[in-house]
Amino acid sequence: MTKIFLHGSGHQAASWRETIAQMPEGANILRPNLAALLERKTARFDNLCAAFAEYCAQAREPLDLCGLSLGGIVALAYALDHSQKVRSLVLIGTPHKVPKAAFALQNLVFRFLPAAAFRTMAFDKADTFALGNSMRALDFSARAHEIGCPTLILCGEKDRANLASARFFAAHIPQAEFEVIPGVGHIVNEEAPAQLARILTNFYAALD
């Protein structure tokens, strides 16, 4: 079964390396770079989702999707619109709607960062702003209950910005399992790759 791991906006596909290295050998795990999927199209959320749908269309069997932060949002959007193509869903530190106050603060901070500071992020400075602005009104509150596949909701104990959303998903997605990872912040795949690998391995083993 093909698994696709999607990174967050502040990181790149390589952020999954340590987690994947500690999962069972032979696991078919893809980790696309979200910016590369756009192929120079305008950095908007609808374009990103369309590009990801094209990427997923290459697979003949249902997919196991796992995403962190922005990656979780993209995975969730795909699962809602292509339910027949998704076997399972893992959402890590994923917001169920864009928090307006936090978004405004993040934009303020980003505005004063030099372009060079974005080199290790998923998108450059201009695309980060463009993508963020296209997601201002994003809200999955009314559709979370439509997710019908087995779903695992994960959130770091110290990721206070997303704990409420994790609990929302756990309460509203019918087949959701929920786990808070102790002592960990937002970037779970880099802060606790071994622990995350164990959790994911157990989740996927239960599906087989």
What are these regions (language model features)?
Residues 116-140, 157-158:
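Hydrophobic, aromatic-rich cap/lid helix
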